[in-house]
């Protein structure tokens, strides 16, 4: 069930956040309003992936700009503005097929994480090169991967391959 996966991922993120010094600890905002989610969908021009909707309904944004290179996940209003400005690609291609996508997160370096509308797979867009690469097969998988980054950051692991 999608909701349980998102809830599990949020618990994992909160646990990982607890490993960090208080000054670097990520913040978890309250739920986005129905109007904010509707405005995001209007900007995207599609129904957003169910898992991302569940995330926004539970936690509008996760802000961790002091963790490694910075993570900003969600934020319905900010994402709607970004989509309206055309900040990031609206289509993701795996080499053989292209599919509509939307931004769901950014890092501290100006890159974005895009979710394909149809399947929720998450891709990293490098704003300097224009290259888009797969990161996770699902939004909850992406959130679990971010949690792993945070665990390794808390352990001062310089060998870990961070996604940001």
Regions found by a protein language model. Give the residues of each.
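A surface-exposed partner-binding patch
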Residues: 1-113, 160-164
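Intrinsically disordered or highly flexible coil/loop and linker segments, enriched in small
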Residues: 22, 152-156
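Short capping loops/turns at secondary-structure boundaries
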Residues: 93-97, 128, 132-135
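A sequence-level detector of short linear motifs
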Residues: 114, 124, 133-134
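Short acidic-glycine loop/turn motifs at beta-strand connectors
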Residues: 116-119
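Intrinsically disordered, low-complexity regulatory segments enriched in Ser/Thr/Pro
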Residues: 121-127
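Compact, glycine/acidic-enriched structural inserts
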Residues: 130-153
């Amino acid at each position: 069930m999608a909701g349980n996966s998102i809830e599990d991922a949020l618990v994992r993120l909160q646990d990982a956040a607890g490993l960090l010094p208080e000054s670097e600890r990520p913040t978890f905002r309250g739920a986005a309003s129905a109007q904010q989610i509707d405005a995001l969908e209007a900007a995207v021009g599609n129904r957003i992936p169910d898992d991302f909707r569940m995330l926004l309904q539970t936690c509008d944004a996760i802000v961790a700009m002091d963790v490694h290179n910075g993570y900003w996940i969600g934020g319905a209003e900010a994402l709607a503005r970004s989509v309206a400005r055309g900040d990031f690609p609206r289509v993701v291609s795996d080499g053989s097929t292209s599919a509509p996508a939307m931004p769901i997160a950014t890092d501290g370096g100006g890159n974005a994480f895009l979710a394909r509308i149809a399947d929720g797979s998450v891709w990293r867009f490098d704003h300097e090169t224009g290259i888009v690469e797969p990161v996770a097969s699902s939004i909850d998988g992406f959130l679990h991967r971010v949690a792993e980054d945070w665990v390794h950051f808390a352990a001062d692991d310089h060998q870990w391959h961070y996604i940001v």
